[in-house]
């Protein structure tokens, strides 16, 4: 067990992280943009909707007066670009997340695309604005965000001034989206934790909002070998450590979509794959050289789906009675159109039944939340 007694979790949905380490008898401080009711530990609200490290986060940490040498800080979101918040954060403890340089280099989209191509990693074709107008279906992507945020369907009436400098046009690929979760250490060794089937929905904010996943998806040997080569590229090029995820789509070929150099929302699907949970496994590879052992869970599948609101309302429900619900808002929380309401989970030892069981649980909650239009 590591010696530090304070663990700070920073993000926009850290409920499952806080649950993963609740048994470690450490002081857990959650600085979360949702500040949900089922967080485990001391909870503080971050005004940034994406959970970015900003002035709010720094002020909260200053007020807590935690001993630097006794504090670990996990960032599963990112950093506000208005200041050098990574350096400021280092004053309060050891950061157990990828370096700001690694994250910034990955967000340099033109360089990343060039490196992917030179390493024979397939990506959907990139178009200029004028080229896009001649194509059948194109999407506009945001290089500084993830989880489907900022993705728009291309409109042929757009002009050059419409695109921001962080946006680019990319061919829309038909197929199923997946993610591969891996854990790596300082020696650039890694293990694949699992492959997930990804769900997304159209909300007020984006056409392709990440809404959930199903774990323990089986791919063939050739596909896994290809994904391993992609992971090796990112670890070598960007020195990634800990838990990270890569999104990809399988059509005729495998196409890389994006890299998430952080603990992702899918990590909790594999909490039981690690002896002491996924967050401790992530911490351990930063503090030690050894990769954790990953348990074989057989045919067990875990799945979750986030329910979004298509109605503005005040949340006045108690869902704590349901053990398959997480990310539960506090009573009297204002929910706007496009906002998440809660997350529905299911675990099944028979992977073939997981989707039906998840659907049943979703129906139960929809019946509970009457007079609310739910996506």
Each PLM stretch: what is its role?
Residues 121-124, 139-140, 149-179, 204-214, ...:
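Conserved ATP-binding module of the ATP-grasp superfamily
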Residues 174-177, 181-233, 237-239, 260-286, ...:
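ATP-dependent carboxylate/phosphate-activation module, predominantly the ATP-grasp catalytic core
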């Amino acid at each position: 067990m590591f010696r530090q007694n304070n663990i700070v979790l920073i993000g926009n949905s850290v409920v499952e992280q806080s649950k993963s380490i609740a048994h470690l008898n450490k002081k857990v401080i959650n600085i979360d943009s949702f500040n949900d009711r089922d967080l485990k530990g001391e909870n503080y609200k971050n005004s940034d909707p994406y959970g970015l490290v900003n002035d709010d986060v720094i002020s909260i940490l200053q007020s807590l007066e935690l001993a630097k040498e006794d504090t670990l800080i996990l960032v599963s979101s990112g950093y506000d670009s208005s200041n050098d918040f990574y350096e400021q954060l280092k004053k309060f403890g050891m950061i157990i997340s990828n370096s700001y340089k690694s994250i910034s280099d990955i967000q340099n989209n033109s360089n990343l695309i060039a490196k992917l191509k030179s390493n024979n990693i397939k990506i959907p074709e990139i178009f200029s604005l004028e080229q896009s107008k001649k194509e059948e279906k194109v999407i506009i992507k945001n290089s500084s965000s993830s989880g489907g945020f900022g993705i728009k369907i291309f409109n042929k009436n757009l002009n050059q001034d419409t695109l921001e400098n962080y946006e680019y046009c990319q061919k829309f690929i038909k197929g199923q989206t997946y993610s591969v979760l891996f854990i790596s250490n300082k020696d650039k060794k890694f293990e694949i934790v699992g492959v997930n089937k990804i769900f997304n929905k159209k909300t007020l904010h984006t056409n392709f909002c990440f809404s959930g996943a199903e774990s323990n998806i089986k791919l063939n040997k050739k596909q896994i070998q290809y994904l391993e080569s992609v992971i090796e590229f990112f670890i070598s090029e960007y020195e990634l450590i800990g838990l990270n995820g890569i999104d990809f789509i399988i059509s005729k070929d495998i196409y890389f979509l994006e890299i998430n150099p952080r603990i992702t929302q899918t990590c909790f699907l594999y909490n039981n794959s690690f002896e002491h949970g996924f967050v401790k496994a992530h911490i351990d590879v930063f503090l030690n050289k050894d990769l954790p052992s990953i348990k074989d869970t057989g045919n067990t599948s875990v799945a979750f789906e986030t329910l979004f609101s298509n109605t503005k309302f005040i949340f006045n429900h108690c869902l704590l009675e349901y053990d398959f619900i997480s990310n539960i808002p506090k009573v009297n929380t204002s929910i706007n159109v496009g906002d998440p309401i809660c997350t529905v989970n299911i675990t099944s030892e028979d992977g073939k039944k997981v989707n039906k069981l998840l659907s049943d649980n979703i129906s139960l909650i929809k019946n509970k939340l009457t007079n609310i239009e739910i996506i």
